[in-house]
């Protein structure tokens, strides 16, 4: 029996399975408790159980494998990892581990890890000699992640506009600057769908901090990737713990030369959570932001990089502006110059119900010549010169009208040439 397969089943199937196995009074229990009871019953029959999770090492030296399905929240179905195993395999917080597990003995509360099969989807012996993430060499992104699907659909317009005005590469540190109701969540869904379709080798994680529960469900159903969330009814400590688990997991995968993409909604809310959690330093900036509160969110955002030795970590985060909160403005100002790609959304365009509501003149990617071919770059510059004299709303309306007549950006450039 596999622990992961059980976690992916809906609660109705699990309750039916519990009934078949003769476990009673489970209808009012939490999903994790039902899984725990099923595994315990299954283990008594002497069959092997396998499980996996992301390691979180606690201060006492031992650790637990947390589940991404539960957004790395501590639960009864977590798997205990002993300090001797952590030392033997040189494990760190964020390592993704698959292995055989055993049921809890008398007086124990958790399942325990018996044998490690893989670490970060690699053989355990390969994981011992990995170079630490902080010691790897960061570079500008050089490999492009195309956003367009090439099917000419209206959903594809967002991807095509991003490709034209702010191309995204592997290792990009991007900021989507968004006022309320400008369509940032839908844009993130589109970006996630495009990355999953055009770059299936990429490990995609969507991290939702302080979001509405219904948006989390929608994201889980539309995105082919890992969706980790901490909703607005959770305490700030929980937001921080989730974000730190996600970034540690991403770093460990990059050490194994994997390409990882994190889509974060939103970095403003994460910074607010850190501001609440950290001990007061006594120095307070404008808007009530503690002087040291933004160090860790900056470390999170700054982890995005293209790695010379192989692998990359891309972070596309949304920053909230025009919310009426001075704190949000201060947080945005602090993050403003740190990214190497910026995509501002415009409230005026969104109010006219024109989507994507991208302000083309202000958006762009640093060193875009490393991501695009020379002829394409020349065409993009000509397009910018053409759109620059126009008003922001007129520019995006003009571009969308022209894109709708063609299926791909190459076709669009050819039609431009003919005119």
From Swiss-Prot:
InterPro entries recorded: AAA+_ATPase, ATPase_F1/V1/A1_a/bsu_nucl-bd, CSD, NA-bd_OB-fold, P-loop_NTPase, Rho-like_N, Rho_factor_ATP-bd, Rho_N_sf
Cellular component aspect of the GO annotation: cytosol
Renumbered residue ranges of the record's region RNA-binding 1: 61-66, 78-80, 108-110
E.C. code: 3.6.4.-
Function: Facilitates transcription termination by a mechanism that involves Rho binding to the nascent RNA, activation of Rho's RNA-dependent ATPase activity, and release of the mRNA from the DNA template.
Keyword Plastid included in the entry's annotation: no
Residues that hold ATP according to the record: 169-174, 181-186, 212
NCBIfam families, A to Z: PRK09376.1, rho
Pfam families on file: ATP-synt_ab (PF00006), Rho_N (PF07498), Rho_RNA_bind (PF07497)
Entry keyword set: ATP-binding, Helicase, Hydrolase, Nucleotide-binding, RNA-binding, Transcription, Transcription regulation, Transcription termination
UniProt source species: Pseudomonas fluorescens biotype C
Biological process per Gene Ontology, one example term: DNA-templated transcription termination
Cited Gene3D superfamilies: 1.10.720.10, Nucleic acid-binding proteins, P-loop containing nucleotide triphosphate hydrolases
Xref: PANTHER family: TRANSCRIPTION TERMINATION FACTOR RHO (PTHR46425:SF1)
Higher taxonomy: Bacteria, Pseudomonadati, Pseudomonadota, Gammaproteobacteria, Pseudomonadales
Assigned protein family: Belongs to the Rho family.
Protein name: Transcription termination factor Rho
Site (RNA-binding 2): 326
Residue stretches making up the Rho RNA-BD domain: 48-123
Superkingdom: Bacteria
GO MF annotations, alphabetized: ATP binding; ATP hydrolysis activity; ATP-dependent activity, acting on RNA; helicase activity; RNA binding
Subunit structure: Homohexamer. The homohexamer assembles into an open ring structure.
Region (RNA-binding 2): 284-288
């Amino acid at each position: 029996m596999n622990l992961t397969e059980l976690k992916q089943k809906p609660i109705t199937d699990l309750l039916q399975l519990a009934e078949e196995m003769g476990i009673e009074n489970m209808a009012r229990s939490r999903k994790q408790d039902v899984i725990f009871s099923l595994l315990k019953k299954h283990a008594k029959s002497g069959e092997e159980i396998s499980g996996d999770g992301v390691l979180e090492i606690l201060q006492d030296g031992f650790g637990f494998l947390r589940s991404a399905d539960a957004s790395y929240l501590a639960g009864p179905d977590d798997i205990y990892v002993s300090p001797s195993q952590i030392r033997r395999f040189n494990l760190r917080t964020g390592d993704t581990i698959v292995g055989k597990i055993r049921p809890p003995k008398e007086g124990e509360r958790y399942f325990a890890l018996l044998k490690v099969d893989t670490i970060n989807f690699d053989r355990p012996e390969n994981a011992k000699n990995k170079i630490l993430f902080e010691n790897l060499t960061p570079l500008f992104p050089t490999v492009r992640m195309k956003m367009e699907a090439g099917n000419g659909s209206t959903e594809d317009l967002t991807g095509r506009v991003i490709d034209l005005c702010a191309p995204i590469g592997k290792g990009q540190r991007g900021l989507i600057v968004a006022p309320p109701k400008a369509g940032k969540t839908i844009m993130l869904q589109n970006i996630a769908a495009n990355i999953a379709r055009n770059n299936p080798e990429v490990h995609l994680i969507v991290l939702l901090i302080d979001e509405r529960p219904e948006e989390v469900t929608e994201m889980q159903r539309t995105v082919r990737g890992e969706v980790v969330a901490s909703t607005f009814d959770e305490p700030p400590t929980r937001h921080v713990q989730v974000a730190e688990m996600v970034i540690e997991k991403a770093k460990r995968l990059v050490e194994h030369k994997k390409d990882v993409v994190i889509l974060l909604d939103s970095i403003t809310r994460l910074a607010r959570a850190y501001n609440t959690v950290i001990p007061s330093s006594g120095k307070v900036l404008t808007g009530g932001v503690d002087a040291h509160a933004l160090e860790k969110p900056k470390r999170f955002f700054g982890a995005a990089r293209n790695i010379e030795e192989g692998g990359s970590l891309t972070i596309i985060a949304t920053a909230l502006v025009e919310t009426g909160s001075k704190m949000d403005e201060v947080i945005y100002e602090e993050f403003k110059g740190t990214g190497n790609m910026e995509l501002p959304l415009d409230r005026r365009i969104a109010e006219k119900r024109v989507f994507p509501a991208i302000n083309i003149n202000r958006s762009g990617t640093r060193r875009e010549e490393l991501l695009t071919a020379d002829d394409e770059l020349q065409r993009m510059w000509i397009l910018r010169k053409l759109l620059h004299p126009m008003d922001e709303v007129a520019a995006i309306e003009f571009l969308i009208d022209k894109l709708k007549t063609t299926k791909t950006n190459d076709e669009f450039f050819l039609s431009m040439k003919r005119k």
